[in-house]
């Protein structure tokens, strides 16, 4: 009998707290502060910081930095508002820096 495989998870690089599901990845083609980043539809076990307007590669956005709830490691940010119509799909979504997350249970 084959063993059931659970969800593929991403964890905080520092403490291994689960922060995202592979199935929630919308795109792997984003740029973060430290390099490549992934856009997720959902996140878990994170703290969302205060909102601020930030000029990003795709224009002005209101974002809030996100960090691990357990160790406070900065992980990326949440898109709160996109000012350009073409960028509205990002609202409510999360950017995780690839360097800040690791695959867990794969």
UniProtKB/Swiss-Prot annotation:
- rRNA-binding: is it a keyword of this entry? no
* Disulfide bond positions: none
Alphabetized UniProt keyword annotations: Metal-binding, Zinc
Which stretches make up the Yippee domain?
Answer: 8-105
Q: Which InterPro entries match?
A: Yippee (IPR034751), Yippee/Mis18/Cereblon (IPR004910), Yippee_fam (IPR039058)
Q: Which residues bind Zn(2+)?
A: 12, 15, 68, 71
Q: Does the keyword Hydrolase apply?
A: no
* GO molecular function, a single term: metal ion binding
Assigned protein family: Belongs to the yippee family.
Q: What is the protein name stated in its UniProt record? A: Protein yippee-like At4g27745
């Amino acid at each position: 009998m084959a063993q059931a495989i659970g969800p593929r998870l991403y964890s905080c690089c520092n403490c291994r707290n689960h922060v995202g599901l592979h199935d929630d990845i919308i795109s792997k083609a984003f740029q973060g502060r430290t390099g490549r980043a992934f856009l997720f539809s959902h996140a878990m076990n994170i703290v969302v910081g205060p909102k601020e307007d930030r000029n990003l590669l795709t224009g002005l956005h209101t974002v809030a930095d996100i960090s691990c709830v357990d160790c406070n490691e900065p992980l990326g940010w949440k898109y709160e508002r996109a000012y350009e119509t073409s960028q509205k799909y990002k609202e409510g979504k999360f950017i995780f820096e690839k360097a800040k997350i690791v695959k867990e249970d794969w």
